[in-house]
Design a protein with these regions (language model features):
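Long, charged N-terminal interaction/targeting segments
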Residues: 1-7, 141, 168
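Conserved N-terminal segment of class I S-adenosyl-L-methionine
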Residues: 2-135, 228, 232-253
């Protein structure tokens, strides 16, 4: 099973995988139905979640109902419990919109919601994050998760995120983070997908961020809070929702 997961993730193009997953969802939900684990995004329960991982396979990672991963479920709980995202009138820009959130966010009456990506079939706007066709100070809230590790000129991308966010606005920019490393590891001479997979953990990544990631965000102007939200949750909740053991949510304010 684990080898099959690796093959599927590394061989099938992401756009095609997104479409296939929606077709297979009803069958998967029936097969895994149970009460042990709950997806907080839609409150569906299952006897187990699906395994996931490009290299190291994680058990109970992918929800069969929303296709949320551990980090998505943690972010959902954070937004629900710690912010006014679901109640305040705000204008939201969502980069590389995750299927786990898309339909839920579209139905929220309090937000004006736009999605953006260069390639995603789920996006409303097709655009390069380094050259956004958007006026400055346009959005109250920006979600841009697991995007920056794909961008060669991440400083330019961060500057664009800062530019289109309103003063006082909030951005959440999660990335794969190696908390053991102070410095980010990047080598732009590595272009072969297999070599990138070895070096950066995924075939289309161009770096592994270290703890200096937050300094990069601060350099372009953001005030950054490193929110370790799992520390606020009980062990029972972490098991119930299949949450990451360690995850920092970068909450960035302009």
């Amino acid at each position: 099973m684990n080898n099959l997961v690796k093959i599927v993730l590394n061989v099938i193009p992401r756009n095609l995988l997104t479409r296939l997953s929606f077709l297979l969802k009803p069958l998967i939900k029936i097969y895994l139905f149970g009460k042990k684990h709950v997806d907080p995004i839609d409150n569906s329960s299952f006897r187990k979640f699906l395994p996931y991982g490009y290299n190291k396979i994680r058990v109970n990672a992918l929800s069969p109902s929303t296709f949320s991963l551990e980090r998505h479920r943690l972010l959902w709980l954070y937004l629900k419990r710690e912010t006014d995202f679901f109640s305040k009138k705000i204008k939201v820009l969502h980069f590389a919109p995750e299927a786990a959130f898309l339909e839920k966010f579209k139905k929220l009456k309090n937000i004006s919601y736009s999605t953006i990506d260069l390639n995603s079939p789920l996006a409303d706007i097709k655009a390069d994050i380094c050259n956004l066709p958007i006026c400055s100070d346009s959005y109250d809230f920006i979600l841009c998760n697991h995007v920056l590790e794909h961008i060669v000129d991440d400083e330019k991308a961060m500057k664009e995120l800062y530019r289109v966010l309103k003063k006082g606005g909030t951005g959440i920019f999660q990335v794969p983070l190696n908390m053991s490393n102070k410095q980010t590891y990047e080598d732009f001479t590595i272009t072969d997908p297999k070599e990138r997979n070895k070096a950066f953990g995924q075939y289309d990544h161009v770096r592994v961020y270290g703890m200096d990631f937050f300094e990069r965000l601060e350099k372009v102007g953001f005030k950054v809070e490193k929110c370790e939200y799992t520390l606020k949750l009980s062990d029972d909740e972490k098991i119930k929702y299949c949450l990451p053991k360690k995850e920092i949510i970068p909450v960035c304010v302009k």
